[in-house]
Amino acid sequence: YNLKSKKTLILFFALAMVASACSSAAVPCDEVEITTGENGLPDLDGCEFTFAVENAYLPFNYIDPADGEGKGWDYDVFNYLAEEMNFTPVFVAAAWDGMIQAVADGQYMIAGDGISITDERDKIVDFSDSYIVLQQRMLVAADNDSISSAADIQNGDFKVATQKGTTNYDLAVSLFGADKVDAYDQFDFAIAAVISGDAAASIVDEVAGLGYMGANKDKVKLVGEGLQTDPLGFAFPDGSPLVAVVNEGLAHMKDNGKLQEINDKFFSPGFTVSYDDIAEVTYDE
């Protein structure tokens, strides 16, 4: 057992460790060979699935300051799919403004955030099957008795707060004109404008409005009929093989009742987390 053999042995172990590290590196899910698992669902062999979330859009996604963990509808659904289809979810915080284009560019394999499926967006990304169909509604301060319909805003001197780059913003502009619409970077900023009186109303997805009201019944309320019907889905890069995989997973969740269970948890007044309760989020440039 001489020095040369010792050096050789050390080199052997070093190379073995490198080889082990390389072999254990997770393969991106859009490159993995998809097989069928024992449960009949696609098996993705432990690959990494990057999921873009804003982490600032209740009830879909947020960071709990108590433990620093990401939580919300997106997290519950995607973590469940990960268990059922053997992949590793990698949640990446991304600003809403530019998220869909980033998916189109291949920066993320999938995006959540309650994305409305539209013909315009479908030109640059592929969508999953819709997991819920919702109404867009008006949200006003709880003590506001001046607004009960879109006509009240159209005929009055009011401002409407929305989030940039959303179908809520597009609908507000089409109904009220751009001069009456103030656009904010995040949804909670728009709601804060309503509560403070800087805006008279906001147009929101009904499920987001119901979730927000769970902890803020004394501050805001939904008024009027639905203004527009929107199906929501996950966004993928155009041509992604993972669309079919996620669609199978969503169908499984619909069949076994898990999707309804998660919807009931987050898309109702029973969801009591407010924007005051969640951690602030910063995004990489």
Regions inferred by a protein language model and the residue ranges of each:
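C-terminal motif of bacterial Sec signal peptides marking the signal peptidase cleavage site
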Residues: 18-21
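Ligand-binding cleft/hinge of the Venus flytrap
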Residues: 61-65, 78-86, 168-185, 213-217
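Short helix-initiation/N-cap motifs at beta->coil->alpha
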Residues: 73, 90-102, 147-148, 182-196, ...
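A ligand-binding cleft/hinge motif common to bilobed small-molecule-binding domains
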Residues: 98-101, 114-123, 171-174, 195-229, ...
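Periplasmic-binding protein-like
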Residues: 55, 133-140, 206-251, 269-285
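Ligand-binding clefts/hinges and TM-proximal coupling segments of bilobed small-molecule sensing domains
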Residues: 24-39, 167-184, 222, 251-285
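Extracytoplasmic small-molecule ligand-binding "clamshell" domains
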Residues: 29-114, 123
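Flexible hinge/capping segments at coil-to-helix
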Residues: 141-159
